[in-house]
């Protein structure tokens, strides 16, 4: 019988530690295994938010035996996001502000209504503003007796999570899953043919979700190809800037595709809640008073679309940096057998790039891509950031 922790890929030590904590929490014994605040870190695709959600399910599990059965009502509702005592915070904008955090703290102060614990799971805790982080810190320092905080962030670097907040949490570091582990999941859980699973796993950068998308979504494969075409376009400066514009446009199209259906559904639901189409007494005044609510929805949807577009663009930049990294590794005599290439299916392109660009140029190219990612984090307009990166790539190639 599959338990919730079966969703983790290549994280055996994490599963053991979280299971021990859930057992201690259930038994109610004083133990160093359980605490009120946890910080899950790991690179994109490592499954840090999945691990946190699985732990939340294990804490709420009502079945006998090892917590996290995956079958009881508490486990299934937690994993589905419908458990009344598990609050999952997924930032839709570029940051988590003070107002939202105060609302979360109010929820955290309540006693659980149906479950064993009141669990607050904050994904992308690195998006907390400084003020919002301080609001959270106050309750983390003195947590309610039956409340558990689960924070997720890329790393323990002070730029990702405040030092003080980090010091109040038990740290759970996740590792990048191996290509073999990802391929096995795609074969056994998704029923993919071995060749398809192994290819998707090898080019996913250790990201399980991305491997699944690349294997099943033609548009995802097209976006990857389009992003990597920028590297060859750099040899022709006029084409390079056009390729950079295509990169931004592709990210915007992906965001629109992801958001459009949800945005329309939210608008319809809000219109219904506000009495759209009503003819009864008070309908006209209700419609007049809805302008502010509609404007707030539009603001949140715009912020969510911006974040989705930035995330899509960042994934493309990681692919571009990976191709330069592969060429640099090859230039220094490394082969795919000693170091895992990011793009093993592009061996000819990697070889050509290594032959055409000196090591210094490859290194400067990687730095240009990383500088672009940092600029996007600082809210520089994507087209400006990409144009500056392309200029840096052209200069690096000519060096």
What are these regions (language model features)?
Residues 1-57, 74-77, 147, 153-316, ...:
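Charged, glycine-rich active-site and insertion segments that engage polyanionic ligands
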Residues 121, 150-151:
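Walker B beta-strand of ABC/ABC-like P-loop ATPase nucleotide-binding domains
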Residues 107, 323, 368:
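Solvent-exposed, charged/polar functional surfaces in cytosolic regulatory/catalytic domains
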Residues 320:
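Conserved phosphate-interacting/catalytic interface
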